[in-house]
């Protein structure tokens, strides 16, 4: 069977459901597909199809995630839902499923719970730009004062973790009523999708961001000079443009004198392309794997940062024992390993396998970084953790 061509007529946004266990994330995901299927915007997907989420591997970590897609009048969405709490933690820290926005599901009958808090905090740490709240199970609450109280609690919690709690849309409804085909259930889902459409901002496309390419390999071509290869992470590089080589050593300026892909010469390379870039006047020994090529001034090298990290459990192939302050593993950024020292917060004695933790790191060499950069922690060549830079300290 021929694959249907993906028609890109509407802007695309990645979102996901987050929230406490049993508050109705998967039911809501199913309800969205079933309601939108009525107008041809989705393929109706039942609860148990979503709940049986396939396992995926991302940077050596196994994560269960369910993906559904649907369309509203304005946008095309890819929506991710995870079955277990640990899957959410891993998913958000590894960025396995990038989220441009989230739907926070809170049960009106229970109010915010520990994982509600943790998911809001993680969303903030990993840079989820915006979220909309679905106050679920309102059919189980008879007292309007109680609903108001829960809404207030949710808004306070969002504000506490740095989201604009007062302006975030909160939609009240029941995913179950929507699944049962009740009109009030359906109305709430449509309201929710309108809020997601209007409140979650359109993400900046990778091609519109400043040019950045992690260097994978360096070659010397006699008579032409030095060529570096890699996959363009963001932006566009045109022949003749000035670029900087950042990380590991002092930043150097150079000029792109050629872009090559599949042995053909191009005028430009753009995000997603695997290219070779010819550098004017740069010697082969002045550039190495692990550095990046970047638009001048767009990124700086740093060696001190704070991170949110998921530490693999023993079952996942991680460490068998906890680690303590001054632990010195390898940090794998983009294309290279750099040794670094971990400093735990004063109230934390150790980090257990299977935990997620916040701590600071000092690398022995600076790496081109900005907040939101993902990395792996490795020990003797195997992955023992995955993290994201939440704050740069120097």
Swiss-Prot record:
Chain's role: GTP hydrolase that promotes the GTP-dependent binding of aminoacyl-tRNA to the A-site of ribosomes during protein biosynthesis.
Family membership noted in the UniProt record: Belongs to the TRAFAC class translation factor GTPase superfamily. Classic translation factor GTPase family. EF-Tu/EF-1A subfamily.
Region feature G2, mapped onto this chain: 60-64
A GO term for molecular function: GTP binding
Region (G4): 136-139
UniProt: Mg(2+) binding residues: 26
Subcellular location: Cytoplasm
Annotated spans, G1: 19-26
Organism annotation: Rickettsia prowazekii (strain Madrid E)
UniProt cross-references to CDD domains, sorted A to Z: EF_Tu (cd01884), EFTU_II (cd03697), EFTU_III (cd03707)
CC annotations in GO: cytoplasm
Keywords: Cytoplasm, Elongation factor, GTP-binding, Hydrolase, Magnesium, Metal-binding, Nucleotide-binding, Protein biosynthesis
Record note on quaternary structure: Monomer.
Renumbered residue ranges of the record's region G3: 81-84
Binding site for GTP: 19-26, 81-85, 136-139
Primary site of residence: cytoplasm
Residues annotated as signal peptide: none
Region span, G5: 174-176
Annotated tr-type G domain residues: 10-204
Entry's EC annotation: 3.6.5.3
Name recorded for this polypeptide: Elongation factor Tu
Catalytic activity: GTP + H2O = GDP + phosphate + H(+)
InterPro entries: EF-Tu_GTP-bd (IPR041709), EF-Tu_GTPase (IPR050055), EFTu-like_2 (IPR004161), EFTU_2 (IPR033720), G_TR_CS (IPR031157), P-loop_NTPase (IPR027417), Small_GTP-bd (IPR005225), T_Tr_GTP-bd_dom (IPR000795)
Gene3D superfamilies: P-loop containing nucleotide triphosphate hydrolases, Translation factors
């Amino acid at each position: 069977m021929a694959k249907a061509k993906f028609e890109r007529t509407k802007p695309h946004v990645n979102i996901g459901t987050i929230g406490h266990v049993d508050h109705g994330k998967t039911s809501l995901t199913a309800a969205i597909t079933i309601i939108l299927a009525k107008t041809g915007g989705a393929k109706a997907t039942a609860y148990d199809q979503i709940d049986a989420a396939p396992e995926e591997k991302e940077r050596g970590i196994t994560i269960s995630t369910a993906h559904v897609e649907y369309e509203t009048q304005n946008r095309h969405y890819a929506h991710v839902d995870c079955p277990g709490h640990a899957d959410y933690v891993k998913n958000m820290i590894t960025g396995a499923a990038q989220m441009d926005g989230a739907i926070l599901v809170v049960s009106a009958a229970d109010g915010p719970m520990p994982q509600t808090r943790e998911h809001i905090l993680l969303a903030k740490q990993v840079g989820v730009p915006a979220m909309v709240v679905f106050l679920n199970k309102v059919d189980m609450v008879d007292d309007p004062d109680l609903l108001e109280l829960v809404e207030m609690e949710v808004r306070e919690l969002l504000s506490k973790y740095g989201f604009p709690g007062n302006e975030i849309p909160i939609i009240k409804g029941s995913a179950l009523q929507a699944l049962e085909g009740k009109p009030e259930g359906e109305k709430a889902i449509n309201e929710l999708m309108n809020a997601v459409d209007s409140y979650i901002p359109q993400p900046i496309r990778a091609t519109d961001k400043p040019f950045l390419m992690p260097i994978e390999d360096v070659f010397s071509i006699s008579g032409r000079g030095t060529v570096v290869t890699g996959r363009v992470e963001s932006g566009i590089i045109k022949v003749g443009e000035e670029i900087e080589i950042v990380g590991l050593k002092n930043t150097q300026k150079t000029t792109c004198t050629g872009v090559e892909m599949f042995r053909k010469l191009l005028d430009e390379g753009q995000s997603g392309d695997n290219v070779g870039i010819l550098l004017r006047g740069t010697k082969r020994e002045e550039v190495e794997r692990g550095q990046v090529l970047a638009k001048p001034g767009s990124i700086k090298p740093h060696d001190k940062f704070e991170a949110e990290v998921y530490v693999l459990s023993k079952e996942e192939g991680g460490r068998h024992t906890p680690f303590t302050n001054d632990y010195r593993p390898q940090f794998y950024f983009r294309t290279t390993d750099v040794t670094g020292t971990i400093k735990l917060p004063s109230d934390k004695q150790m980090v257990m396998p299977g935990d997620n933790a916040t701590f600071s790191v000092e690398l022995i060499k600076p790496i081109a970084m900005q907040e939101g950069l993902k990395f792996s922690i490795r020990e003797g060549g195997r992955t023992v953790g995955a993290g994201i830079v939440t704050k740069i300290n120097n």
